[in-house]
């Protein structure tokens, strides 16, 4: 018959494993890549009809998943999961030697933390139309900013001839194709197995944080890059008593960029 000690440990491990179904039900990121490629192609074609057609465009998406679970004396106390996604759009007007980035490092109005990013819906299956609408809307905004700053750059160029930086604004690179499979939720089970080897957990507190940032990049030259940036953090603290009654605390922290390590 299982002891109370073992039951507490099982509840803690079960809570951590169960979090995978909250945090990573299924990665549908392959569909997102297809949406980005299709929208980029369509928007580039449509903007070629404008007075100032772009010569280069790219989309960058940062898709963040994070989870946190904490337990005390084997009982689950807190668990949470977050998922957010942002799009950064770049539109270049002119040519590689002179474009809207000439006098603007960001090529458009930046936010406090750099170039402005816009939120994207996180449901690839149920909100595909909303994702496409958000991409289209942001591309239109970036294009308008690009035209404004390109015209400003032309005006400044006309009065600064001979005194401005001659370096090109853009250097084309070779086309890259790189794809990483979505990070498997099975990793959580493997990571949580560490608790099976440490009985001290049932006498104290444990916290587990898991984070995956999945990045997408596509451009009009044909580059496609999809990669994962994961990390795991486990904090364990416990207290035991020596034979003489003295309390002996123990705190351990485990961190890894790659949870396999």
Regions found by a protein language model. Name each.
Residues 27-261:
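Active-site bordering "gate/hinge" segments
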């Amino acid at each position: 018959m299982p002891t109370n000690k073992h039951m507490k440990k099982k509840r803690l491990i079960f809570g951590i494993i169960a979090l995978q179904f909250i945090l990573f039900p299924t990665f549908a990121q392959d569909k997102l890549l297809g949406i980005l490629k299709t929208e980029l192609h369509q928007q580039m074609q449509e903007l070629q009809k404008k007075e100032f057609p772009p010569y280069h465009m790219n989309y960058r998406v940062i898709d963040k998943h994070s989870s946190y679970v904490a337990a005390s004396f084997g009982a689950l106390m807190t668990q949470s999961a977050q998922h957010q996604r942002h799009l950064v759009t770049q539109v270049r007007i002119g040519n590689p030697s002179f474009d809207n980035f000439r006098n603007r490092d960001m090529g458009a109005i930046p936010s406090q933390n750099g170039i402005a990013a816009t939120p994207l819906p996180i449901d690839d299956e149920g909100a595909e139309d909303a994702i496409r609408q958000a991409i289209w809307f942001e591309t239109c905004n970036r294009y308008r900013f690009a035209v404004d700053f390109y015209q400003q750059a032309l005006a400044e160029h006309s009065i600064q001839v001979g005194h401005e930086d001659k370096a090109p604004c853009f250097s084309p690179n070779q086309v890259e194709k790189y794809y990483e499979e979505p990070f498997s939720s099975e990793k959580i089970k493997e990571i949580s197995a560490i608790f099976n080897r440490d009985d001290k957990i049932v006498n104290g507190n444990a916290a587990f944080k898991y984070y995956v940032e999945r990045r997408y990049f596509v451009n009009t030259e044909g580059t496609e890059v999809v990669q994962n940036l994961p990390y795991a953090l486990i904090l364990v603290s416990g207290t035991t008593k020596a034979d003489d009654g003295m309390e002996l605390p123990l705190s351990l922290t485990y961190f890894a960029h790659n949870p396999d390590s």
